Amino acid sequence: MSLKYSSTTADYLIWSDAMNLIRKLAKDENYKISLLIALGCFTGLRISDILSLRWKQILDADEFTVIEKKTGKVRTIRLNPQLQQHIKECYEHINPIGINAPILISQKGTIFTVQRINIILKEVKKKYKLKIKNFSCHSLRKTFGRQVYNMNSDNAELALVKLMELFNHSSVAITKRYLGLRQEEILQTYDCLSF
């Protein structure tokens, strides 16, 4: 986590790069991290909420409910068929101790920490030569947000309102800043000038 008002912030992955990464990790038999990235990109959950998930919540489920650790709010998440299939494949390869087990357990038998996940993601960035400056747990949530926004560009304001509610932001302006849209809009101002 960065200090408030500091310039370091997580970046998002281009959606196609994120999907390719999920597939490559699974192909390389790194099912836990493949699952982590898939859940982050497809649900927009914070890492603290992903780490608290148990197999019984997500395996063979169309949707599941979480109580967000940061806000205490109840949130229902729908899982699309492709993600459901990926969850099932990861479950079969990970072979956890049971359906009640947390989905992301380290080799030591403990739930991964946020700090450890961030270290792993930096290693993944290097190994797979990802074109992203600051890759961290939060990048997954931002990747989700950017994809939702991009897929609804014909009705961008509605997409931003939906994302504002999903992210529990107090305003659309905060959501725009969170997704890096405000900075992009400012930089595009320079592009409209001609010589």
Regions found by a protein language model. Name each.
Residues 1-19, 72-81, 100:
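DNA breakage-rejoining catalytic core of tyrosine-based enzymes
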Residues 2, 13-43, 154-155:
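Basic, Lys/Arg- and aromatic-enriched nucleic-acid-binding interface segment
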Residues 34-46, 63-64, 146-151:
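Short pre-functional
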Residues 49-50, 145, 153-169:
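Active-site-proximal segment of tyrosine recombinases
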Residues 52-83:
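Conserved tyrosine-mediated DNA breakage-rejoining catalytic core shared by Y-recombinases
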Residues 68-72, 167-192:
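Catalytic-site neighborhood detector that most strongly recognizes the C-terminal catalytic loop/helix
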Residues 132-151:
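Short basic/aromatic active-site micro-motif
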